[in-house]
Amino acid sequence: LGYLTKLGKITLSTSVYYNYTKNSFQMVRYVEGLNPDGVPITTSSFVNIGEENRAGFEFTLNYSPYKWWKLNSNFNLFRVQTKGDFYYSYFDVSNNLIDKVQNFDNTASSWFARINSKISLPSKIDWQTNITYNGPQNNAQGNVKGIFAMNLAFSKDVLKEKATVALNVNDVINSRVRKLETYIPGQIDSDSEMQWRKRQITLSFTYRFNKLKTDKDPK
């Protein structure tokens, strides 16, 4: 269910939504065994834990203050409810099989936001900035901290628009790090971090043979 309106240079849209997932997969940490000193050996993997109900509100704003500057943003607030149990087994130091079950019934609220800016600089250089933030969220095993990230991109058409030179900087301040606090009574109490990829800077050159950038693909 959504609503769209335009006020001068501003375009606003709002919507509410509901999603139901019968087989919901989540990242789960569990004890796979014990080392000779009795310290738990933990494993992280995606597991089908049961069902998920998600409801939320989304707000989108597009704004062009000038011909050379375009802004678009998105804000999403949601509430998620999970239901299910996770069964697993491991051997203790005496080689006894230990059966465990963890309940994943949980309700949490969170949000995420995105802002994208596109500026046309002199000499027909395009400058794009993308900023995202995923808010913190609790789960049945602990919580995930908020994640902030920013990307930059500069591009220019050359050779009579037959080619494009682009400079991209992904994760400018090296902040796209997933921080987890995990607590399972009697088994796990830990803080961990996971970074998919550190800051990257790439320079690319794309040439379009027998085709201008403004040409349309043949139907």
Q: Which residues are covered by each model-predicted region?
A:
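Outer membrane beta-barrel strand-and-loop segments of large Gram-negative receptors
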Residues: 7, 11-70, 74, 100-103, ...
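C-terminal beta-barrel architecture of Gram-negative outer-membrane proteins
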Residues: 107-158, 173, 181-182
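Repeated loop/turn-to-beta-strand initiation elements of outer-membrane beta-barrel proteins
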Residues: 9-12, 67-71, 123-128, 160-165, ...
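Transmembrane beta-barrel strands of outer-membrane/channel proteins
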Residues: 3, 14-20, 73-79, 129-133, ...
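Outer-membrane beta-barrel translocator domains and adjoining extracellular loop/strand segments
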Residues: 16, 24-33, 38-40, 83-92, ...
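Residues that define the transmembrane beta-barrel architecture of outer-membrane proteins
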Residues: 6-8, 51-55, 103-111, 146-150, ...
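C-terminal beta-signal and adjacent terminal beta-strands/loops
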Residues: 156-219
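Residues on the lipid-exposed face of transmembrane beta-strands in outer-membrane beta-barrel proteins
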Residues: 1-5, 57-63, 115-119, 152-156, ...
